Protein backbone atom coordinates (compact mmCIF):
# COMPACT_ATOMS: atom_id res chain seq x y z
CA UNK A 1 0.00 0.00 0.00
CA UNK A 2 1.36 3.41 -0.99
CA UNK A 3 1.52 6.18 1.62
CA UNK A 4 -0.54 9.23 0.73
CA UNK A 5 0.46 12.55 2.25
CA UNK A 6 -2.43 14.93 2.81
CA UNK A 7 -3.14 17.92 4.97
CA UNK A 8 -5.87 17.47 7.55
CA UNK A 9 -8.27 19.54 5.43
CA UNK A 10 -7.54 17.50 2.29
CA UNK A 11 -8.06 14.24 4.20
CA UNK A 12 -11.32 15.59 5.64
CA UNK A 13 -12.68 16.57 2.23
CA UNK A 14 -11.62 13.27 0.64
CA UNK A 15 -13.51 11.49 3.43
CA UNK A 16 -16.62 13.69 3.05
CA UNK A 17 -16.65 13.19 -0.73
CA UNK A 18 -16.42 9.41 -0.27
CA UNK A 19 -19.60 9.35 1.86
CA UNK A 20 -22.63 8.36 -0.20
CA UNK A 21 -26.31 7.77 0.46
CA UNK A 22 -29.13 6.24 -1.56
CA UNK A 23 -32.09 8.41 -2.50
CA UNK A 24 -34.83 6.91 -4.69
CA UNK A 25 -32.54 4.05 -5.67
CA UNK A 26 -29.72 6.37 -6.79
CA UNK A 27 -26.36 6.65 -5.08
CA UNK A 28 -25.75 10.35 -4.35
CA UNK A 29 -23.27 12.31 -2.22
CA UNK A 30 -24.13 12.53 1.47
CA UNK A 31 -22.55 16.00 1.46
CA UNK A 32 -23.74 17.76 -1.73
CA UNK A 33 -22.11 21.11 -1.01
CA UNK A 34 -20.59 23.57 1.41
CA UNK A 35 -21.12 27.21 2.29
CA UNK A 36 -18.01 29.15 3.27
CA UNK A 37 -16.85 32.51 4.49
CA UNK A 38 -13.07 32.50 4.66
CA UNK A 39 -10.95 34.27 7.21
CA UNK A 40 -8.38 33.55 9.88
CA UNK A 41 -8.67 29.98 11.05
CA UNK A 42 -9.94 28.36 7.85
CA UNK A 43 -8.62 30.08 4.72
CA UNK A 44 -5.18 28.45 4.55
CA UNK A 45 -6.42 24.92 5.09
CA UNK A 46 -10.09 24.47 4.21
CA UNK A 47 -10.05 27.15 1.52
CA UNK A 48 -7.32 25.42 -0.45
CA UNK A 49 -8.92 21.99 -0.08
CA UNK A 50 -12.36 23.27 -1.11
CA UNK A 51 -10.85 24.87 -4.21
CA UNK A 52 -9.10 21.65 -5.20
CA UNK A 53 -12.20 19.47 -4.66
CA UNK A 54 -14.70 21.98 -6.13
CA UNK A 55 -15.89 19.54 -8.81
CA UNK A 56 -16.71 16.82 -6.27
CA UNK A 57 -17.93 19.00 -3.39
CA UNK A 58 -19.21 22.36 -4.66
CA UNK A 59 -18.49 25.35 -2.46
CA UNK A 60 -20.77 28.37 -2.26
CA UNK A 61 -19.71 31.75 -0.93
CA UNK A 62 -21.83 32.86 1.98
CA UNK A 63 -22.50 36.41 3.11
CA UNK A 64 -23.51 35.72 6.72
CA UNK A 65 -22.59 32.73 8.82
CA UNK A 66 -26.00 32.24 10.40
CA UNK A 67 -27.77 32.35 7.04
CA UNK A 68 -25.34 29.74 5.65
CA UNK A 69 -26.05 27.37 8.52
CA UNK A 70 -29.81 27.97 8.44
CA UNK A 71 -29.79 27.34 4.67
CA UNK A 72 -28.07 24.03 5.37
CA UNK A 73 -30.81 23.20 7.88
CA UNK A 74 -33.47 24.06 5.30
CA UNK A 75 -31.74 21.84 2.75
CA UNK A 76 -31.62 18.93 5.21
CA UNK A 77 -35.31 19.38 5.96
CA UNK A 78 -36.20 19.54 2.25
CA UNK A 79 -34.16 16.39 1.61
CA UNK A 80 -35.83 14.62 4.56
CA UNK A 81 -32.52 14.32 6.43
CA UNK A 82 -30.92 12.25 3.66
CA UNK A 83 -28.25 14.79 2.71
CA UNK A 84 -26.14 17.12 4.84
CA UNK A 85 -24.77 20.56 3.97
CA UNK A 86 -21.54 21.97 5.37
CA UNK A 87 -20.96 25.50 6.66
CA UNK A 88 -17.54 26.90 7.56
CA UNK A 89 -16.48 30.29 8.85
CA UNK A 90 -13.50 32.04 10.33
CA UNK A 91 -12.94 31.94 14.05
CA UNK A 92 -14.25 34.80 16.14
CA UNK A 93 -17.59 36.50 15.50
CA UNK A 94 -18.15 34.39 12.37
CA UNK A 95 -18.12 31.20 14.39
CA UNK A 96 -20.37 32.73 17.03
CA UNK A 97 -22.95 33.59 14.37
CA UNK A 98 -23.41 29.86 13.68
CA UNK A 99 -24.19 28.89 17.30
CA UNK A 100 -27.90 29.77 17.01
CA UNK A 101 -28.23 27.65 13.87
CA UNK A 102 -26.49 24.77 15.67
CA UNK A 103 -29.17 25.02 18.37
CA UNK A 104 -31.92 25.01 15.73
CA UNK A 105 -30.44 21.92 14.08
CA UNK A 106 -30.09 20.13 17.42
CA UNK A 107 -33.59 20.91 18.65
CA UNK A 108 -35.15 19.85 15.33
CA UNK A 109 -32.86 16.82 14.95
CA UNK A 110 -31.63 17.96 11.55
CA UNK A 111 -28.15 17.07 10.28
CA UNK A 112 -25.70 19.91 9.71
CA UNK A 113 -21.90 19.87 9.63
CA UNK A 114 -20.37 23.06 11.00
CA UNK A 115 -16.65 23.68 10.64
CA UNK A 116 -15.86 26.82 12.64
CA UNK A 117 -12.44 28.33 12.14
CA UNK A 118 -9.59 26.92 14.15
CA UNK A 119 -7.97 28.70 17.06
CA UNK A 120 -4.40 28.59 18.33
CA UNK A 121 -3.60 25.18 19.77
CA UNK A 122 0.00 25.63 20.86
CA UNK A 123 0.08 29.15 22.30
CA UNK A 124 -2.05 31.79 23.91
CA UNK A 125 -3.62 34.08 21.30
CA UNK A 126 -1.76 37.34 21.83
CA UNK A 127 -2.18 40.00 20.78
CA UNK A 128 -5.92 39.66 21.08
CA UNK A 129 -7.56 39.70 17.68
CA UNK A 130 -11.08 38.31 17.91
CA UNK A 131 -10.69 35.91 20.79
CA UNK A 132 -12.86 35.45 23.84
CA UNK A 133 -11.25 37.18 26.78
CA UNK A 134 -11.84 35.20 29.97
CA UNK A 135 -9.13 35.81 32.53
CA UNK A 136 -10.29 32.82 34.62
CA UNK A 137 -9.82 30.46 31.68
CA UNK A 138 -7.31 31.79 29.14
CA UNK A 139 -7.65 28.74 26.88
CA UNK A 140 -11.38 29.24 26.38
CA UNK A 141 -12.37 30.14 22.83
CA UNK A 142 -15.39 30.74 20.61
CA UNK A 143 -15.68 27.11 19.63
CA UNK A 144 -16.49 26.19 23.24
CA UNK A 145 -19.89 27.86 22.70
CA UNK A 146 -20.84 24.97 20.40
CA UNK A 147 -20.56 22.32 23.13
CA UNK A 148 -24.12 22.69 24.51
CA UNK A 149 -25.71 22.68 21.04
CA UNK A 150 -23.70 19.94 19.33
CA UNK A 151 -23.46 16.20 19.36
Label each residue range with its predicted role:
Residues 2-151:
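N-terminal alpha/beta PP-like core and its mobile active-site loop of ThDP/TPP-dependent enzymes
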